């Protein structure tokens, strides 16, 4: 056997060394081989082969124990080809096409996601009629919970004979700056609704008779001021703070019987003489009453009883007279009446942060909607609600209905601004909704009303979907 050994192990080892040295010289341009990283190539190849074998083995095991495109025990399925949703009702061997994921989750009683199955697999299973809630949202995603809800009117061409009012609903954080902000205590805005005139202040709305110049001039309404219309929604949202008119004084014009000078008849106005900022009083049948400057001016404009100026009376004399109360709704000082030409936007905002005991309401006016620049142009022009909705994702809300017989109600508001009633807590849980936020009915009630989301409604069979009774053609240029 020794005669057939043409090479020795040392020769083979030397040949391999020289081969590696040549490779080293070609790759690294250095024959000294102080280190030899190329020796790890074979180890890397071996490791790669091992990993590939393990991956293939794992894929084979997954395909055996959990094959894709097979129904298995899943009850919520989706066709991988057509994306049609199906549910397998408990205790049934029929597949039911379902209109939307919302209905499927209500039927099954959980917020599971559909499993993709091949069409061939689905075609082997018996099928029943379609079920679900027509008009329900496909799903019920939620965004950042909104703590601020705002209703705005924007008047176009306020100087015209028929100004146009556009309503916007803002379910998002507002952007307040010098162009739009809360009405101050010394500001007001003149509006009209159904033929009546109202003055809007920071606290709400006050009915006012523009023909009563004694009151209007006292509160700062110019004779040229023109009221502009507001929407029904904004009118109802603004709280009614009562009329701005002077209470009648009994026996006005009759002589006083409280010891004042004869020229001060009942209903006349006088002032104290010793104070640096004179206090005005009105004479009543059984005494005198303090009034603010605006009320004093309105009373004198109504009837000054021949007095060019309010007479001055010693404070010591006034102190001996019984003091009564004259309830006047007029503000302490005249208002700065905002013109709709300069402030075409009027808003009512409701805000309740976590931990607040009660909501805070604000009246806002300005040149534009209180929206950040990034939100301009994101409004959804609703068909049935006559409003443009600006909303940051879906919202799950709980609110107190104005009808005490109804009590609390839960709603889901989808990203399109449509509200859907939630039947009960179980329905909300099955849809994956939790932690409802408070919201005002004054705003939520103006959104387009969708169907109630309940398990009973989702278990109704249909041959076909009903047609929308109020469709709208897509604007030209969009289709």
Swiss-Prot record:
**What is the species of this protein?**
Mycolicibacterium smegmatis (strain MKD8) (Mycobacterium smegmatis)
Q: Out of the domains of life, which is the source?
A: Bacteria
Q: Which GO terms describe its molecular function?
A: ATP binding; hydrolase activity
Q: What does this protein do?
A: An ATPase. Part of the ESX-1 / type VII specialized secretion system (T7SS), which exports several proteins including EsxA and EsxB. Plays a role in DNA conjugation, in both donor and recipient strains.
Q: Which UniProt keywords apply?
A: ATP-binding, Cell inner membrane, Cell membrane, Disulfide bond, Hydrolase, Membrane, Nucleotide-binding, Transmembrane, Transmembrane helix, Transport
Its organism's taxonomic lineage begins at: Bacteria, Bacillati, Actinomycetota, Actinomycetes, Mycobacteriales
Q: Which residues lie on this side of the membrane: Cytoplasmic?
A: 1-44
The subcellular location is:
Cell inner membrane
Matching PANTHER family: ESX-2 SECRETION SYSTEM ATPASE ECCB2
Q: Record's InterPro entries?
A: T7SS_EccB, T7SS_EccB_R1, T7SS_EccB_R3
The record's listing under Pfam families reads: T7SS_ESX1_EccB (PF05108)
Question: Please, what other remarks does the record include?
Answer: DNA conjugation in M.smegmatis is unidirectional with distinct donor and recipient strains; mc(2)155 is a donor strain while MKD8 is a recipient strain. Mutations in a donor strain that alter DNA transfer do not always alter DNA transfer in a recipient strain.
Phenotype upon gene inactivation: Loss of DNA conjugation when disrupted in recipient strain, strain does not secrete EsxB.
Q: How does it assemble?
A: Part of the ESX-1 / type VII secretion system (T7SS), which is composed of cytosolic and membrane components. The ESX-1 membrane complex is composed of EccB1, EccCa1, EccCb1, EccD1 and EccE1.
Q: Name one GO cellular component term.
A: extracellular region
- In its UniProt entry, what is this protein called? ESX-1 secretion system ATPase EccB1
Major location (coarse): membrane
SS bond list = 152-347
Similarity comment: family membership: Belongs to the EccB family.
- Kindly indicate whether the keyword Magnesium belongs to this entry: no
């Amino acid at each position: 056997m020794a005669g057939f050994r043409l090479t020795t192990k040392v020769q083979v080892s030397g040949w391999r060394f020289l081969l590696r040295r040549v490779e080293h010289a070609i790759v690294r341009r250095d024959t000294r081989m102080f280190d030899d990283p190329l020796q790890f190539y074979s180890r890397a190849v071996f490791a790669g082969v091992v990993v590939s074998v393990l991956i293939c083995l794992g894929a084979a095991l997954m395909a055996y124990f959990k094959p894709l495109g097979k129904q298995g025990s899943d009850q919520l399925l989706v066709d991988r080809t057509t994306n049609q949703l199906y549910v397998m009702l408990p205790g049934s061997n029929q597949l039911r096409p379902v209109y939307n994921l919302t209905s499927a989750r209500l039927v099954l009683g959980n917020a599971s996601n559909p499993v993709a199955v091949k069409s061939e697999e689905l075609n082997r299973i018996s099928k029943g009629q379609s079920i679900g809630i027509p008009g329900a949202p496909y799903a019920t995603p939620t965004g950042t919970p909104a703590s601020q809800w705002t209703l705005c009117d924007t008047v176009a061409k306020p100087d015209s004979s028929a100004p146009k009012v556009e309503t916007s609903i803002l379910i998002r954080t507002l952007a307040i700056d010098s162009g739009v902000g809360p009405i101050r205590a010394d500001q007001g805005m003149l509006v009209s609704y159904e033929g009546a005139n109202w003055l809007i202040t920071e606290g709400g709305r006050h009915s006012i008779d523009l023909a009563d110049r004694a009151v209007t001039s006292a509160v700062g309404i110019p004779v040229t001021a023109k009221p502009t219309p507001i929407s029904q929604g904004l009118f109802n949202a603004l709280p009614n703070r009562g009329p701005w008119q002077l209470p009648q004084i009994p026996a006005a014009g009759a002589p006083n019987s409280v010891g004042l000078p004869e020229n001060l008849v009942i209903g006349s106005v006088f002032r104290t003489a010793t104070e640096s900022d004179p206090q005005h009083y009105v004479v009543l049948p059984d005494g005198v009453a303090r009034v603010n400057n605006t009320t004093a001016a309105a009373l004198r404009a109504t009837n000054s009883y021949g007095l060019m100026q309010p007479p001055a009376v010693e404070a010591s004399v006034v102190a001996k007279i019984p003091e009564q109360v004259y309830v006047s709704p007029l503000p302490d000082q005249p208002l700065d009446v905002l013109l709709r030409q300069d402030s075409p936007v009027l808003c009512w905002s409701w805000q309740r942060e976590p931990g607040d005991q009660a909501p805070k309401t604000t009246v806002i006016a300005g040149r534009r909607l209180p929206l950040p620049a990034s939100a301009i142009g994101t409004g959804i022009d609703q068909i049935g609600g006559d409003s443009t909705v600006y909303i940051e994702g879906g919202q799950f809300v709980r609110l107190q209905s104005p009808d005490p017989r109804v009590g609390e109600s839960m709603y889901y508001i989808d990203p399109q601004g449509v509200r859907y009633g939630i039947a009960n807590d179980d329905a909300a849980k099955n849809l994956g909704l939790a932690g409802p936020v408070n919201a005002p009915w004054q705003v939520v009630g103006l959104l387009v009303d969708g169907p109630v989301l309940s398990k009973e409604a989702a278990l109704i069979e249909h041959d076909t979907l009903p047609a929308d009774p109020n469709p709208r053609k897509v604007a030209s240029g969009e289709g």
